[in-house]
Amino acid sequence: MEPRDLALDTAVTRLKAAPGWYTANLPPGWNFLTPCGGVLMTVAMRAMQEELNDPDLRPLSANTHFCSPVPDGPLEVRVEVLRHGGAAAQIRAQLSSTTVPGPGLEVSATFGRVRQGVDVIDVVRPDVPGPEAAQRMDEAVGPGPRAKPLFFENFETRLALGHLWWRPGWDAGPARLMRWFQYKFPQRLADGRFDPLAIPPIADTMPPALIQKLGPDHEPFHAPSLDLTVHFLQDTTSQWLLTNVHARRARAGYATADLELWDDRGTLLAVATQMMMLRRFPAKP
């Protein structure tokens, strides 16, 4: 499959039928089993940006609740601006399929202007191999049709810390995984910055960290997101991004994980957290 352009595939069109109403058409190239929740989140946030129509407002935080599965294809987004102030704006959006019933997902976000203030960081980028030295992951992740979701065809990926979880013969360890991601179709804004709305799809890749703790003989499962929260911290012009994921706890059919997102220059770009549901793959007929 040819790599997809996230910006093009998540573009929205304003409808004149009602205020705050947008449509999009998402191709299947961003699917796991269904579209990546982070990609759907990006669609909703593009509609938010359009509705705000204020280029100086940048995303600060966004929280998404995934209420029902949303297939690829035609989508609609309904946006409501809660407050558009001098320093920040609060906004929410509801995204759903136009072909399958269900509430879809809800996003609440804050956009803000750059302000003067303290500049402090109390964490350093993990000391792991850079993208050029790290192990390539551009291969199938197991036998059968689920081996490599279409989503990953859009990225160059490198393993910085952890095990290739689809292979046998490794020992379980901490529930941590670090990977380098680079969009094959670069996601740059007109001024050269990495598009911050390209962060949610990368943030929504946390489940394999849990497998590092379970080991190679775990029962296969998939882990649809129940929610995803992203805090957008700093811009970058880099395209290689490092995910540092820790799956802190799993019990009762659910798991929580958190993620730091760094660029290859040591800049902390974003942090994210999510709750996921652990589900067995359906039995083959």
Question: Model-predicted segments: where are they?
Answer:
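Terminal targeting signals and extreme-terminal segments of soluble enzymes
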Residues: M1-P285
